[in-house]
């Protein structure tokens, strides 16, 4: 189970790129290329921020570690990476258990970014710090009921189907008011913002989602921690940052292709 004293998510990208003086221990020798890839992505995020006159501490890098071994996660944790995203619940639970006893991994912040089935909500509520794929009230209700009292409220993002396609996951923009109205009353959930996975052809998806995010912020001043806009991956990270993303999700560019 996660550490109740863990600090909430914050940026993990060094403001000073010269700060990269890689410190590795013996177990990291086989992961030098991983460290270099992570450093390169950090630099790309910083450069994207600089291009639009944003501070690097406005954007958090979420390292998507699905299908990758716990050893790789530990290596990046030793470098300072704190936020990790997992799609597959059973695999994630195994990593959380393996890494839980390692001092350098105690401050890891785990994000669940996969689809949520009703029979999996308890494990998610008990083991993750963030859920980025909330799209239905019934799931929110279960997460709220199953979040242990000794843990801080579970941070949640609403996944928005910004393309309004029937085949895609996410809450339709038109249904957001009703879902927000329900979630904001759950004491064991902390509603933090929105997440999208837009179609490549949807060229204005980022701008539209940013506008949604700002509209909700104005309409719901009671959401005091409404501060997170998770959008952008390896191929469109810079565009997302230019449109106000506060969290980018990067997997393959850091960890390499699936084995």
Across the structure, where does each feature detected by a protein language model lie?
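Conserved alpha/beta-domain cores
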Residues: 2-6, 12-235, 241-243, 255
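Gly/Pro- and small hydrophobic-enriched strand-loop and loop-to-helix capping segments
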Residues: 245-259
């Amino acid at each position: 189970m996660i550490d109740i004293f863990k600090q909430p998510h914050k940026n993990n990208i060094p403001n000073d790129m010269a700060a990269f003086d890689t410190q590795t221990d013996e177990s990291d020798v086989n992961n030098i290329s991983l460290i270099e890839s992570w450093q390169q992505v950090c630099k790309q995020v910083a450069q994207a921020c600089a291009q639009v006159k944003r501070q690097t501490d406005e954007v958090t890098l979420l390292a998507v570690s699905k299908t990758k071994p716990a050893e790789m996660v530990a290596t990046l944790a030793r470098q300072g990476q704190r936020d990790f995203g997992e799609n597959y619940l059973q695999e994630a639970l195994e990593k959380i258990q393996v890494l839980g006893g390692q001092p350098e991994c105690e401050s890891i912040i785990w994000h669940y970014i996969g689809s949520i089935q009703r029979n999996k909500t308890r494990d998610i509520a008990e083991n993750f710090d963030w859920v980025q794929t909330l799209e239905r009230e019934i799931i929110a209700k279960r997460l709220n009921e199953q979040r242990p009292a000794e843990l801080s409220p579970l941070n949640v993002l609403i996944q928005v189907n910004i393309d309004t396609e029937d085949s895609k996951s996410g809450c339709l923009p038109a249904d957001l008011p009703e879902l927000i109205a329900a979630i904001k009353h759950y004491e064991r959930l902390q509603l933090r913002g929105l997440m999208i996975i837009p179609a490549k052809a949807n060229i204005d998806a980022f701008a539209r989602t940013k506008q949604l995010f700002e509209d909700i912020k104005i309409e719901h001043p009671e959401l005091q921690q409404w501060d997170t806009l998770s959008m952008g991956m390896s191929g469109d990270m810079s565009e997302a940052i230019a449109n106000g993303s506060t969290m980018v999700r990067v997997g393959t560019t850091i960890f390499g292709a699936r084995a």
